[in-house]
Amino acid sequence: AMALANKENSGSKKIWGFDSFQGIPMAGEFDDVQVGIGEITHDKFAPLSERLISSGITVHSLESVISNFTNKGLYDSSIRFVKGWFQNTLPEIADQVESISILRLDGDLYESTLVCLEYLYPKVSKGGAVIVDDYLLTGCRVAVEHYFKSIDEPVPEMICVDGNMVHYFIK
């Protein structure tokens, strides 16, 4: 949807897509479910480096995503995909991201959501939208709470989009 809207506006905005393209990593300390699986059966207190492996859920290759964009006539130079775990790619790439109008977070888990907020939220323009796809999952909600506490700001009022998981706020 964002790529289509951007195309209709002459591709004036850069669209960044960060994804592991390996699936969702293993849940951690603040998560109460392993997304897509349910009960957590691994050591969620293990070091992050040991949990940055795919749980096997929601795996789409970068090539298939580019193919889908291309087939719909949406893939152009305004779109940049970054492959890898957020914890590994954001520290290296975030400086290249300029102001953000819409930040959509779909990290599913605490650590994925928190690292995205740490590196990308400061770049969200005043009046920009922040969408948290999985806000009702404990890990995502706690990540939002912890992030805003760390920057000494109140947690923004979250507005539910779909009557379920997806929530957003305006900066």
List where the protein language model places each region.
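S-adenosylmethionine/decaboxylated-SAM
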Residues: 1-171
